[in-house]
Amino acid sequence: MFLLASAQKDLSMCSFRLFGLQKPKEKEVWSTEVTDEDFKNAIKDEYGVKYSKDWKRLLKAPIGLKGKYSIREGVKVVGNDAFQGCGFLTNIDLPESLTSIGRNAFWGCDSLTSIIIPNGVTSIGDHAFSKCNSLKSIIIPDSVTSIGNYAFLCCDSLTSINIPDGVTSIGECAFYNCNSLTSINIPDSVTSIGYHAFSDCDSLTSINIPNGVTSIGDCAFENCHSLTSINIPDGVTSIGDCAFSSCYSLTSINIPNSVTSIGYYAFKWCKSLMSINIPDSVTSIGNGAFSDCKSLLNINIPNGVTSIGDSVFVNCNSLISITIPSSVIAIGMNPFRGCHADLKNESKAFIYEHNVLFDRDKTAIISYRAKEANYVIPDSVISIGGFAFSECNSLTSIIIPDSVTSIGDFAFSGCDSLTSINIPNGVTNIGQGAFKNCGSLSPQVKSDIIQRFGGRSLL
């Protein structure tokens, strides 16, 4: 009896302790999605703004809402599209209880001049403040960890913004076309800068990319015409396509030793860029990467680069010299068109003689850089590469041997002095625009080309 009583006593104490434990409170999750059911059960305040029946979610404001509006304290979420198109809204107070701002929440509120996002908000949704054309200032709290795609797109009046510590990613087009933005602070917590994140920020003069960033997205700073300097930190491994394209005021840039690839058109039309250092870590240079950099005087291609893309140095007409290093095994369509630099070749994968660049076996012409009026293509050549003779204005006649079977895209485009050319019967393919803007070719020659290969070769 004693043992049983003791056991019962122990069991009772154990049971008390067990049932006395409290289950941890789960974190509340509030959705920014608004459904038909939400609208069906919605309640309105005196301004006609719709809320969920528990007053936790703001669902939709009437498009005619004017002046200043204060969201009720206790609201957790501003739903997707909540104030979209409220063009007469000039000021809004967000409650301290707020945690999320939904997609398109204030899209097109073009009279809104300033906004303070309360501490507690963790995410700013896609397009949240897109096209708020009068927005001059915004305070983003330390609690925010992500800025959505297109979040501040076309905020024309925004002059500066501080991105708080804690934000790890800046979304696609987040500040696209914020053309009054002169300065921006990107914290060390950011690891990626998205596609078009700051493109067309025409007043941005300088920017510091933090050490945590490993990739610079495609077109991230495209058309930042006033950008004069930029620091790319160690740790960045790739520079995206068009990343700094048309940064007209950029005079110099240092690429760190961590970068392995330079994307297509990465520095195209950086017309003030005079020098650039490409580190030994780079293995590939994308198509058009430095095209139209008209002030570029010097550039080194390090031994380690294996491929040079199409049109990489097109119209770099101030460039003094270029050396193709021994590591290069692939070269795209005429990278040197419109570039008058002295060319030196150290690669065994190519032959450079008499100012003409061939492949190893002289079966393909890559770039014709001579100034002669007449040229006879060697009998070993099978193909004429894209843009190979493009814009050779001194060329008046050319003889193509019977060995040639293909003529690449735009191969002779812009040869406006060319009057004589033969196309052998063995040629089976002529690329688009192969003879575009060859204004001195006779109508008969053009007619023969069209009859054999179609009008595409002249367009």
Stretches with model-predicted labels:
Residues 2-5, 14-50, 56, 61-77, ...:
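Structural signature of tandem-repeat unit edges
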Residues 80-81, 102-107, 125-128, 148-153, ...:
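Consensus positions within tandem repeat domains that build extended binding/scaffold surfaces
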Residues 359:
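Active-site beta-strand termini and strand-to-loop segments that position acidic
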Residues 365:
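Trp/Tyr-centric glycan-recognition "aromatic platform" motifs on solvent-exposed beta-strand/loop surfaces
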